[in-house]
Regions:
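S-adenosyl-L-methionine-dependent methyltransferase catalytic core, i.e., the SAM/SAH-binding region
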Residues: 1-245
Length: 245
């Protein structure tokens, strides 16, 4: 499969990440392998890269893309939050650098079929890890209006949070909201008319908030940051790069 996703600012990221060419590095969100490919090109034959991700389909693509590097690279289906357990299991105490590329890849947006995009008509899932947790449709169809409003405001600062939450609750009384397009159309017809045709799609912030909630993105980053000092070599870098919506 041809992979269209290109990592953002890859040269700048790799320049600061790789401080010791023969070191041990972690790509905590390998995705389809864009950053990992460049890391492997720039570390020495004695260097090692550990790749983590929870998206099963992305991992399969990364394994194919990075297979040329052989045993210099380990690809493991696990969250970066569990990096301490992963390192312990493979017998590594310290690493020289860690990369997190937070957010969605274009592959997930365009090809995953999990409802990340409000343009496509797909199941309203939004789980990065299809093997765990509640799908976005479960949140949309079961949370109270107050909780939905809070979620939209806290995770996306959606100015129309109350209107959208009320519309969701009213709509689901008629039947479940199970597709991304169904939800997007509901939001489009809910917000005031003069705000419906601006540059940013009216559903952008709602979809962002749901994705963050479904995947516990903020909680995961907070947990990870608490663990960093225990396995990062002194004075070396932890890089976190968030992709724009």
């Amino acid at each position: 499969m041809e992979i269209s996703h290109q990592p953002v600012m890859v040269d700048e990221v790799i320049q600061y990440l790789i401080t010791i060419p023969e070191g041990i590095y972690v790509d905590g969100t390998v995705g389809t392998g864009g950053h990992s490919l460049e890391i492997c090109k720039r570390i020495s034959p004695k260097g090692e890269l550990i790749c983590l991700d929870i998206d099963r389909s992305s991992i399969l693509l990364a394994k194919e893309r990075l297979s040329v590097f052989g045993d210099r690279i380990k690809i493991i289906k696990e969250s970066y939050v569990a990096i301490d357990k992963v390192l312990k299991k493979i017998g590594i105490d310290k690493v020289n650098g860690i990369l997190l590329d937070l957010g969605m890849s274009s592959y997930q947006l365009e090809s995953s079929g999990r409802g990340f995009s409000f343009i496509k008509d797909e199941p309203l899932d939004m789980r990065m890890d299809e093997d765990r947790g509640a799908a976005a449709s479960e949140l949309v169809n079961t949370l109270s209006m107050e909780r939905l409003q809070e979620l939209l405001w806290v995770y996306a600062q959606e100015r129309w949070a109350k209107l959208i939450a009320r519309a969701i609750v009213e709509e689901r009384r008629k039947g479940p909201i199970n597709s991304s397009r169904q939800l997007a159309l509901l939001i489009e017809t809910t917000i005031p008319v003069k705000y419906r045709h601006r540059k940013r799609h009216p559903a952008t912030k709602t979809f962002q908030a749901l994705r963050i909630a479904v995947n516990k993105e903020l909680e995961n980053v907070a947990d990870f940051l608490e663990k960093c000092p225990s396995f990062l070599e002194n004075s070396l870098f932890f890089l976190s790069q968030a992709l724009p919506l």
